């Protein structure tokens, strides 16, 4: 990753290499930027840097999803489908619970076999929206406590990136049909 000063004297501020020696190509998630913070995540870890390239913290959390930041909290779903809430300032994990156990607690149902790996993580109107590989939409309240508001199974598989426009979610399914969900 490069930090470039293109405004004044067009120079490189700093360079960071996140690729392991054993890797041919670095496979990371999209970079998350908020104010003066840069979050880099890959299949093995999540790291927070400031704009000067200094590492603030680094956690050994395996995730294939980019984290989401809101205020002082970083939201992550790890590879084992655990929801983690991390303090942005110091990297301490404030909350960690299996999504399946949240569902069992709030809905008294065991959907572990039905809900597959989480593929998408969004923060919308103060709630987390998790979308599983097999199109379960899980809405999680995060204001006062962490609990599940709703679970909805949709009859389609998402095969594109998701776009949010005018309070609607737009995406393409496997048979190349466009869907709008509000």
Where are the model-predicted features located?
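Short loop/turn segments that connect beta-strands within beta-propeller blades
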Residues: 5-9, 50-54, 87-90, 141-145, ...
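Loop/turn-rich, solvent-exposed surfaces of beta-rich toroidal or solenoidal domains
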Residues: 77, 107-142
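Conserved beta-propeller blade signature
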Residues: 37-40, 74-76, 84, 127-130, ...
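Extracytoplasmic beta-rich repeat domains
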Residues: 7-35, 43, 54-71, 94-123, ...
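Loop/turn residues immediately N-terminal
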Residues: 1-2, 44-47, 80-83, 134-138, ...
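Extended non-catalytic domains of envelope/secretory-pathway proteins
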Residues: 4, 33-38, 49, 127-128
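Low-complexity, polar/charged sequence tracts that form flexible coils or short amphipathic helices
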Residues: 39-41, 49, 58-61, 76-78, ...
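Blade-level signature of beta-propeller repeat domains, shared across WD40, Kelch, NHL, RCC1
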Residues: 157-182
């Amino acid at each position: 990753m490069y930090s470039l000063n293109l405004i004044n004297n067009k120079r490189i501020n700093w360079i960071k290499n996140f690729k392991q020696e054993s890797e041919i190509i670095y496979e990371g998630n999209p970079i998350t930027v908020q104010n003066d913070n840069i979050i880099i995540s890959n299949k093995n870890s999540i790291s927070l840097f400031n704009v000067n390239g200094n590492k603030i913290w680094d956690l050994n959390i395996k995730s294939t999803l980019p984290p989401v930041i809101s205020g002082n909290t970083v939201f992550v779903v790890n590879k084992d489908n655990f929801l983690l809430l991390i303090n942005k300032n110091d990297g301490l994990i404030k909350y960690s619970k299996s999504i399946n156990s949240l569902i069992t607690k709030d809905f008294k149902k065991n959907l572990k076999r039905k809900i597959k790996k989480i593929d998408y993580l969004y923060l919308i109107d103060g709630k987390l929206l998790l979308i599983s590989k097999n199109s379960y939409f899980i809405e999680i309240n995060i204001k006062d406590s962490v609990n599940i508001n709703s679970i909805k199974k949709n009859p389609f598989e998402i095969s594109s990136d998701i776009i949010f426009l005018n309070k609607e979610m737009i995406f393409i399914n496997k048979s190349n049909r466009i869907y709008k969900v509000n």
